[in-house]
Amino acid sequence: MKVFEFLKGKRGAMGIGTLIIFIAMVLVAAVAAAVLINTSGFLQQKAMATGKESTEQVASGLSTLQVIGIHDNKAINYLAIYITPNAGSAAIDLNQTKILITDGEKKAVLRYNSNAYADLTTGGEVTNTSLAAWNLSGGEFGIIVLQDADGSCKSTTPVINKGDIVALTINASAVGLNLVPRTTVTGSVIPEFGAPAVIEFTTPAAYLSTQEVIQLQ
């Protein structure tokens, strides 16, 4: 009888032990599942953020619409580079944008001067060199706003986005560029991220006194 009771108690103890082990396994599995779910969610968000950044990096950038020059019959003294954001581009801060330009001898890196700004969205003459946007020294470029539906491109916060068009102004003489006839000019407008706008043209064989403003690109 005592042996039977002993065996019965032993089986009961084994049953309780098995139950404890089972509960412990369930708890461990639950914790592991929670960790996996959290990790999976984090990685998914990280992947989505990285994908968005990559898409913006690929789609974003600037395009050159045209380049015009203003000459004095001997050399081009002023340049205006018309740019717009690429289709699908994120907003671009021109404060963080640089212009690299060379005439084959002089190489210059230009940064935006917030005092050299003009808004011609309601009309005006880009080539009017009395505009503040043309008041530049070496190492600087200015901005003339031509199209800006949401008013995002201000003198101190020059941000351009979809549909905006601006002319970046350069005082070629102040920079030290010698833009006499038959000069090959190359360069780029480099935003903080995305594709740069390309500058590439050769000045005409001669400058006509009857045509002070010429299209170069």
UniProtKB/Swiss-Prot annotation:
Proregion positions: 1-12
Subcellular location(s) of the protein: Archaeal flagellum
Keyword Repeat among record annotations: no
UniProt keyword 4Fe-4S present: no
Keywords, in A-Z order: Archaeal flagellum
InterPro entries: Flagellin/pilin_N_arc, Flagellin_arc
One Pfam family linked to the record: Arch_flagellin
Single Gene Ontology BP annotation: archaeal or bacterial-type flagellum-dependent cell motility
Gene Ontology CC terms, in alphabetical order: archaeal-type flagellum
Gene Ontology molecular function, alphabetical: structural molecule activity
Similarity-based family: Belongs to the archaeal flagellin family.
NCBIfam families for the chain: arch_flag_Nterm (TIGR02537), PRK08541.1 (NF006325)
Function: Flagellin is the subunit protein which polymerizes to form the filaments of archaeal flagella.
Protein name (record): Flagellin B2
Top-level taxonomy: Archaea, Methanobacteriati, Methanobacteriota, Methanomada group, Methanococci
